[in-house]
From Swiss-Prot:
Name of this chain's protein: Chaperonin GroEL 2
Major subcellular site: cytoplasm
Complex and partners: Forms a cylinder of 14 subunits composed of two heptameric rings stacked back-to-back. Interacts with the co-chaperonin GroES.
Gene transcribed to yield this protein: groEL2
Family, as annotated: Belongs to the chaperonin (HSP60) family.
GO CC terms, sorted: cytoplasm
GO biological process: protein refolding
Amino acid sequence: MAKRIIYNENARRALEKGMDILCESVAVTLGPKGRNVVLEKKFGAPQIVNDGVTIAKEIELEDNIENTGVALIRQAASKTNDAAGDGTTTATVLAHAMVKEGMRNVVAGANAISLKRGIEKAAGFLVEKIAENARSVEDSTAIAQVGTISAGNDDEVGQMIANAMDKVGKEGVISLEEGKSMTTELEVTEGMRFEKGYISPYFATDTERMEAVLDEPYILLTDKKITLVQDLVPVLEQAARAGKPLLVIAEDIEKEALATLVVNRLRGVLNVAAVKAPGFGDRRKAMLEDIAVLTGGQVITEDAGLKLETAKLEMMGQARRITITKDTTTLVAEGNEADVQARCEQIRRQMDETESSYDKEKLQERLAKLAGGVAVIKVGAATETEMKDRKLRLEDAINSTKAAVEEGIVPGGGTTLAHLGPQLASWAADNLTGEELIGATIVERALTAPLKRIAENAGQNGAVIAERVREKEFNVGFDASVNEFTDMFAAGIVDPAKVTRSALQNAASIAGMVLTTECIISDKPEPKENAPTGAGMGGDFDY
């Protein structure tokens, strides 16, 4: 296919145009008075969202080069979402502001490589400052505040997430389910999550989210590698007769046996899924035993004289619900409380006896998985469209609270970045020279972009608000919900430091890459040929 090659200014301008379109679409959602965006779907009802990364993923432009710009800035949002689970709109607005500011300097003749170096050094300084100004999260009030802000100022959601964290602990798991009622409810159950996903994507029952969900399944636990399909047949037949799904957790499943499971799943003979056992060596056996205790089953191991071909349903574990993604498996089981407590006690004793800090850490992980449990938030809404929107907001809120527990909280509403601008300017003046100093200035000017946009979405003059915030103390910012300046910590308007840090780092990374772009090579669109006459369906036939 023929290629289209664009150089210098034209290349950067085309990228910038794509970024402008994406940033404007995403930025309208920023802040307490941010609006929603409606996504048209080929199938099903339109989706109304307020989530930056979801909007960014939907945007595809006709022009290939502009689309490249969209893809680059989308990466800033996606990476921030992967690292911190929230802050995607902030990352997009920051990256766009840095690129805009940087373009002016490149056009004026500045060396793009030196600018990039300056941007990187400025980002490094700001990351340190964010960590310095972060407050650790000690009580559930702070957790509730973070959840409330992230869920779009929904106090009920913030309180619910704080309650969930109280019950399952900081190491526990909080998952989301679509509820059956109009109200959002919290349900805490025993459960466990481990970092192994399905072996084959064909096991996914929900292809949109790429998840496999098994309700009330049997669980086959074994520490051996399953190579022959004959080993599995007796168990598969028993599970099919019982009419329940089956989850196989084994060291590995070879091609032939795996193909049999996939075929059974696709033909609808048996709802089955397979995951590799978590951990390695002796720790794998211990974790399989943990799962067995939790689910009331047995590990089919030759050490205990048990073989797969003689396994009975009574030896299987059982769970209420199992959710498997490509990376994780979450088991929600009920009952067996006495056994679980005894197992937890045993792990605690092992922790007391061991002297290795690594072993202690791994035992602590196992204890958290066993004792922590899983909190399930059942999302309620009047319509399916509202349900999807609430679910996305809740997902952001849960990720934010976890990020806050990890690295602490900073003043929210774009306040932290705006206040760090003058500190960056004085540091850069002392430590950087020439075009590297200009690179740091690019970052410094971009730092007020999120605050300006929050103010503009609330109907205020962004530039004026940003200047007034910078004149005040570090914790004082602009509360766009009531159009007042206030102490952000006192008002409960806080952001997780991890979210702010990730947004800044990813924005700086993308901006540096775009500014150093000198040439773009893309496929030249082929002219569409007109279809020959009479080639449509139907032709000369009578029906």
